[in-house]
Amino acid sequence: MFNNDFSPSHQNPFKSFLMGGFECADHLNAFGNRVDLFQASGHDHYLEEDYDRLNQIEIQTIREGIRWSFVETIPYCYDWSEVERIIKISQDKNVQVVWDICHFGFPDDLTPLHPMFARRFSHLCREFVIKYRSLVPDGLLIVTPINEVSFLSWLGGDARGTSPYCVGQGWEVKYSMMKAYIEGIEMMKEVDPSIRIMITEPLIGIVTNDPANILSLMEAEKKHLEQFQVHDILCGTICPELRGKPEYLDIIGVNYYYNNQWINETHAFLPWAEEPPHPLFRSLHSLVESVFIRYGRPIVISETSHPGEDRAKWICSIAKECISILKSGLPLFGCCFYPIVDRPDWDNLDYWHHSGIFDIVDTNSLKRVPDAMSIHAIIEFKKQINALQVFA
């Protein structure tokens, strides 16, 4: 669909193929309570140690968020103190940060349906780049303006799981967030034209349990393709009035979890670990290939993890798929394990997912405990990547 004239996309901009993401959600949960998983997971306290742990296993690229709701408590007034600390420590530790400007949360006085949402967000984006470049004048800056617009528009617009707590407004929320997303890119590029954009959206598979029925097939395919509305708006294929451009669809991050494939009619999740595979389950390689065929852009597995006892098995499964993708010649630029450190549930902060490669057992000290099997799986994954000389 696209050529490579507008961006040096043939060059991988990431320091390491394996990446780690720190939970930074700061939204209002299903009960209307503000969550701060950056603080709840202890990342604020263990920031330096967390980076040291990742350096020890040669993960040098991470995802962090600025937490919009904490940066802008008064309209157009910004407190960058915590962001400055992350920038300084990451620079000192030689860690590359990919920045989320909005990771589910917005200031108390805003929702995506607020008439000033896009303006507030775009000014935030501009001021972030100005602040960042005042501290780091050189080098590449990679930004995700809004994480998972597709999921967030469903959660807040259709499922009443976060602000604006609506039903039947998913498209309106998505449209408004994409207006903000694009205006944010425009203002960031005014400050720094070299900025790279990594979109991060769920990669899903929706199928019918009645493939002999043409109407069921068409309905499942329609639902499946809705995952690409955000991408199509961003590159201007649909909703051109929002000023999307092909070059804005720069690096495509796909967030892929164990429950990302389901049956349209029943919403039953397709099992991922069966041998031989469930006949309706698509490999990650197949899903990634379909994204590349559609857009022709480099791809990153921008989030993946599994809770509980199967997390190491999941890492091995993802490693196998990534190696298969790389051997096929598709431009897979990286794989990010998210969360890299355990986190509590948004709606029940007493329940911990145990999905990171570092566990939190003592919820008072929030001390990190390595999950030995997950660490081993990561190290083996790294060996396979090195054997392919992806980062020779």
Show where each model-derived region lies.
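Non-catalytic scaffold segments within catalytic domains of secreted glycoside hydrolases
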Residues: 2-45, 51, 55-57, 71-392
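Oxyanion-hole/transition-state-stabilizing segment in secreted/luminal serine hydrolases
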Residues: 64-70
